[in-house]
Amino acid sequence: MFSLLTIFSCNPKKNQSETHQNTSFEEISFKYSTKNKNFVSAHRGGSGIHGFPENCVETFEHLYQKGIQIFEIDVAETKDNQLILMHDNSLQRTSTGRQDVNQVDLKTIKEYFLVDDFGQQTSYKIPTFAEALNWGKSKPIYFMVDIKKSVDYRDIVKTIEQANMQKQVVLVTYTIGQAKKLHQLVPDMLLSVSMRNEREFNEMMNSGIPTDKMVAFTGTRRNDKTFLNKIHDKDILVIFGTLGNLDKSASTRNGQLYRDLEKDGVDIFATDRAIDVHQTINKN
């Protein structure tokens, strides 16, 4: 999912049944420090929650009330060139629509309802990218924006700038080419860049992109602590994806895996179990 952090320093602990008191902007920095706390990035804006679909503003609000302040979201483009939140090429899995996203205009898409990960229809609508940004604008939250292949980077940037949300967005990249292109377009914005191994680390160090504009995504396979320390030595935060099998494994081990990864040097957990991970890493 930046120098998102002085990573959430000194969060007050509350009973899990209560609304969590979120960290303020003043307590957040995306530059690595040994004083940082770890935090969670909700994959697809929150998944695996009964009654709350992925890439849904109401899900963001639900998780925000539980202490989640980082949301990885997917931005796609409709037939009439409008930006919406949608992971798949097709509307079918996560909404009552059946067509491909690029075959339907926004007016039609707004007639559909979102479906949760258990196949249950909700009353929630598919949000536009602008609507999602507007929700987050008044809150100490951050979006990690995963841009679908058909979407023009310039349209993404224009929407972010119109919302004045440049400081609350991290743009997700998967290749050094994408990272260079986006950095050239918006040199002041943060980028999530791939650093899964020594080769990718060296490529990024020689890319010309300042390290203070990087957050390192180290993949979904566990790296050794020495490699993560090398990233930290550049004052770059480490994001690790526990999506899929690792989240499933952790759920059977009382969250011990997350604590082990924390000791390894993981700063940001990209996860499908946002609430569980947040509670685990914030226990006394």
Predicted regions and their residues:
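Phosphate-group recognition and catalysis centered on beta-loop-alpha active-site segments
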Residues: 10-284
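Bacterial N-terminal signal peptides
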Residues: 1-7
